[in-house]
Design a protein with these regions (language model features):
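Short beta-strand scaffold segments in enzyme catalytic cores
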Residues: 84-87
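Acidic/polar N-terminal loop/beta-strand segments that form early-domain functional surfaces
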Residues: 21, 38, 71-73, 89
């Protein structure tokens, strides 16, 4: 509670800033040591899932199929730490359901994904069957791991991925479908994805109308950064969506609307990392993934307080 109060006052999620703003009469150096002991508390590390379990029962109550957005983010580039987060899509900002820090070397690895899904399964209510929404960075091994839990998944497919008709070997690049897309979403029925590790799923197509957005990046700073070109190409490219949801459960238009909520998780990442618009976690020099997990838990408690 004191750490959340300090974060609300200083709006900077670092060890020293939390210590400097603790609402106690102790000297600053003792408050900083107090936060340091909190981040290194092994008992709290073990009980962390119990907190998320209580949190999940609260925000998922009454919804047997929550829309869960999942994505990676480079929280601390200098310390080479990544965070994998699951958020429940709501009106406006999504609310974090569960998140865990991993070393950069484990980003997008099957080991990290399986551990994350196992933790997520342990905190969700038993009567819940979530729809996991992810971007094109998640591949077939992720889809199959989600299916093993009896859950549904919805993901975008890009790049050199191939598809084929069921029972046939007529493999073609997924980019061949782009010319068939329009502003009216449609389903192509069930197809097979990836020749090396095939999976059967429903394929959908959609191309949104141009929004006329222009690059506003400064011409003096980072003007040659490659990210605007990458994001622009992704935004202009039609959506090829894949899902294991039965055709009769959701219409193509409903599935497109669900996937469009994925940007909510990007907004909450900015709320957490940005020094200008959020909690400034990017300035943290914490190098331990376990200690980072506690900092994420403090941020979640503040987010939940503001959401309520």
């Amino acid at each position: 509670t004191l750490a959340c109060h300090a974060l609300l006052d200083c709006k900077t999620l670092t060890l020293t800033e939390l210590g400097r703003n603790l609402p106690t009469k102790a000297r600053t150096k003792h408050n900083i040591k107090r936060i340091d002991r909190l981040l290194g508390n092994r008992h709290l590390h073990k009980e962390r899932l119990a907190v998320y379990r209580w949190h999940a029962s609260f925000i998922c109550s009454g919804n047997t199929m929550p829309i869960v957005l999942v994505d990676w983010s480079d929280i601390s580039e200098q310390k080479r730490l990544m965070v994998l987060r699951a958020s429940v899509a709501l009106h406006g900002r999504s609310v974090t359901l569960y998140e865990k820090a991993f070393p950069l070397s484990e980003q997008c690895s099957k080991k990290a994904h399986d551990q994350f899904l196992a933790d997520l399964a342990s905190i969700l209510p038993s009567n819940t069957t979530p729809l996991i929404v992810s971007d094109a960075g998640f591949k077939v091994p992720w889809y199959k791991s989600v299916e093993k839990l009896g859950w549904y998944w919805l993901s975008r497919v890009r790049g050199k991925v191939q598809y084929a008709d069921l029972g046939a070997e007529n493999w073609k690049p997924i980019s061949n479908l782009h010319d068939m897309s329009s502003s009216h979403s449609k389903t192509l029925g069930y197809k097979r994805l990836t020749k090396s590790n095939p999976i059967s799923c429903q394929i959908l197509l959609y191309k949104s109308r141009s929004k006329g957005r222009k690059n506003q990046r400064s011409t003096r700073t980072h003007c040659h950064h490659p990210s605007p070109k990458i994001y622009s190409a992704s935004a202009k490219e039609p959506w090829v969506l894949a899902t294991n949801l039965p055709v009769e459960i959701r219409t193509p238009k409903q599935l497109v609307n669900i996937y469009s909520k994925r940007m909510q998780i990007e907004e909450t990442f900015r709320d957490l990392k940005s020094p200008a618009y959020g909690l400034g976690l990017r300035h943290s020099r914490t190098s331990s993934s376990e200690r980072f997990d506690i900092m994420l838990l403090i941020a979640l408690m503040l987010q939940l307080t503001c959401w309520l």
